[in-house]
Amino acid sequence: MTIMRKNHPLLKIINHSFIDLPTPSNISAWWNFGSLLGICLMVQIITGLFLAMHYTSDTTTAFSSVTHICRDVNYGWLIRYAHANGASMFFICLFIHVGRGIYYGSYMLNETWNIGIILLLTTMATAFVGYVLPWGQMSFWGATVITNLLSAIPYIGTTLVEWIWGGFSVDKATLTRFFAFHFILPFIITALVLVHLLFLHETGSNNPSGLNSDSDKIPFHPYYTIKDILGVLLLLMVLMFLVLFFPDVLGDPDNYTPANPLNTPAHIKPEWYFLFAYAILRSIPNKLGGVLALLLSILILAAFPLLNSSKQHGLIYRPITQTLYWIFVANLLILTWIGGQPVEYPFTTIGQISSIMYFMIIVIFMPMASMVENNILKFI
C-alpha cells in the first residue's frame, strides 16, 4: 500500500497533499480552520444539491417550494437548516482563518493570500445570491438594494443593473439567474481551493513563531489528521446544536413573509456576516463613495503584504501591533452590530467613526507601529 500511494499517479497527489506533507511541528489549533472550511464547503455542496432537487426558481413557487421542503420532504427541515446555518459556520471559519493569517503574517505567502482574497469574494457572492432564493421579504429587498448599488457606476451603471436583473426590477429572470449562479459558484470555489492549496504546498505552511521551520517538520498524517478530526467533530457538534435547537437565531424573521414588491420592510439588512461591510457602505453619504468603500473593505486585505515593513514575521513578539490588531477585531464587531441597527443617531455616528478606524488601523497605525517596533529592536 505504501508503494502504491507513492507511485500511483492519482494517489501520489493525495499522498503529497494530505499524508506525507511535511508540516511544521508547532502549528496550533488556529491552523485547523483551513480543513474546517473544506468540511463546510462539502456540507454546503451536499445539502445544497438535495435542496436543489426540490426547489423551483420561479417567483410564484419559490417560497412555497422552500415551505414544501421543510414540511413534506423527509428530513427536509434538517437539510434546509443545515444549509442555512452551515453558511454561518462557513463565514465564522473564514473570518477566523483570515484573522489568523493577519496575526501570524501568513499574508507574506503572496500567491496563497491573493487566491484567498478571491475565494473570500467568491464565497460572499455565493452567499448573497443564495440569500435571494427563498424569495422572502428580506430576500427580495436585499437583492433590490444591493444590486441597485451598481447603478452608482458612472455611464454604464443603470444599464448594468437592468442587465443583471433581466428587466426593470428584481423579478422571475433575476431569481432564475441567481439560482444558476448559486449552483455553479461552489464548484468554482472548489477549483479555487485546489489552486489555494497548490500555492500553499509550494512554499509550505507558516507557523506561530514566524521562523523558518524546514529543520523541524513532521508528516501531516497521523499527527494533523487526528487534530483536524477533533476540529471537524467540534464544528459539526456546534452546527447540529444550532440546527436542532436554534435554527432561526441567525436568520431574519422578515424572510418568513413571502416577497412583496409593494411593501418595504422597516429595516433592510443582509445576513449577519455581511453587516460589517454594510455598515461601512452606509457610513458614507455618497452612493458611489459607499460602493467603493464596500469593495475596499475586502480588497484592503491585498494591501497587507505591501504595507508590511516589520523585521519580524507575525505579531507574536510585537506588542504594539498586537494591541492594534485586537482593537481592529473589536472595531469589526462594532461594525457588525451597527450594520444591523436602524439609520439614526447615534448609530450613524458610531458607524462612521468605526469605518474610519477600520481603514486607518490597516493603512496608517499598523505600518507606523511596525516602524516603531523596528527602531526598538535596535536598542535590544
UniProtKB/Swiss-Prot annotation:
Listed cofactors: heme b
Residues bound to heme b b566: 97, 196
Protein's GO biological process: mitochondrial electron transport, ubiquinol to cytochrome c
InterPro entries reported in the protein's UniProt record: Cyt_b/b6_C (IPR005798), Cyt_b/b6_C_sf (IPR036150), Cyt_b/b6_N (IPR005797), Cytb/b6-like_sf (IPR027387), Cytochrome_b (IPR030689), Cytochrome_b_C_euk/bac (IPR048260), Cytochrome_b_N_euk/bac (IPR048259), Di-haem_cyt_TM (IPR016174)
Main localization (coarse): mitochondrion
Pfam families to which the protein is assigned, alphabetical: Cytochrom_B_C, Cytochrome_B
Organism domain of life: Eukaryota
Binding note for cofactor: Binds 2 heme b groups non-covalently.
Binding of a ubiquinone, residues: 201
Function statement: Component of the ubiquinol-cytochrome c reductase complex (complex III or cytochrome b-c1 complex) that is part of the mitochondrial respiratory chain. The b-c1 complex mediates electron transfer from ubiquinol to cytochrome c. Contributes to the generation of a proton gradient across the mitochondrial membrane that is then used for ATP synthesis.
Identification of the protein by name: Cytochrome b
Organism expressing this protein natively: Microryzomys minutus (Forest small rice rat)
Gene that specifies this protein: MT-CYB
